[in-house]
Regions:
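A hydrophobic alpha-helical transmembrane-helix feature that marks the membrane cores
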Residues: 1-224
Length: 224
């Protein structure tokens, strides 16, 4: 009986060590990819890259993220792919940031969006890590919500309704927040063991929250 208890304790200890390792590697890689994206965004701003590059970079990064990254995530090549994906997203983001900086209150809008994104992520990450809850029950809600958002985005291309833009941006922030809780909860509870895929998921959530905050702040801070 005592040997069984010792064995169970040993297994639990190893599981905790593995979870902590995945969490640590995820945060380190996430920090590195965010920093690399910032450098690429700055580079594209200095180069004066046109805004059309945003769509091209988004499409290219989606193709890499959906079809290449999952196949390389368990090897060293996965690190190269994740930096390529996040670098593309950062490069495409540069013209968007330049557009907002051109506003009369552009620096304030961009700074507030950055700060808001950091507060949201750190708050959600802290809660998921301390509560150790399993947030997988939110998966259905997130999937349906994403489909609704996609339909709304397509519809608003033609409708051009500011109120719909506000609703879409707010909805995306909520959905991405839920995805952050789900992803970190999965790591903490041992459901996610690949730190490269975990980094990709968290990066996309942070990226979309930042873009959505920019849109909201740009709308409400507009002088029009």
């Amino acid at each position: 009986m005592e040997q069984r208890s010792m064995h169970q304790a040993s297994v639990a200890s190893l599981s905790t060590l593995e979870t902590n390792k995945v969490l640590k590697n995820t945060y380190l890689l996430l920090s590195a990819t965010l920093g690399f994206s910032a450098i690429m965004a700055g580079l594209s701003m200095v180069m004066g890259v046109p805004s059309g590059a945003y769509i091209i970079c988004i499409i290219a990064s989606m193709v890499l993220g959906m079809f290449v990254l999952p196949r390389t995530a368990n090897s060293g090549a996965g690190l190269g792919v994740i930096f390529l994906v996040t670098g593309l997203l950062g490069f495409g983001l540069g013209p968007i940031i330049s557009m907002y900086l051109a506003l009369s209150n552009g620096a304030q809008v961009v700074g507030t969006a950055l700060g808001g994104t950091a507060v949201i992520f750190l708050g959600l990450a802290g809660y998921a890590m301390t509560s150790k809850r399993d947030f997988s029950f939110m998966g259905g809600f997130v999937a349906i919500g994403l489909m609704v958002m996609i339909i709304g985005i397509i519809a608003n291309i033609f409708l051009q309704m500011p109120l719909l833009s506000v609703a879409i941006s707010g909805g995306i922030i909520m959905l991405m927040s839920a995805m952050i809780l789900m992803q970190i909860g999965a790591i903490v509870n041992g459901g996610e063991t690949n730190y490269i895929m975990a980094t990709y998921s968290l990066y996309l959530s942070i990226f979309n929250i930042f873009i959505s905050l920019l849109q909201l702040l740009g709308i409400f801070g507009s002088d029009d």
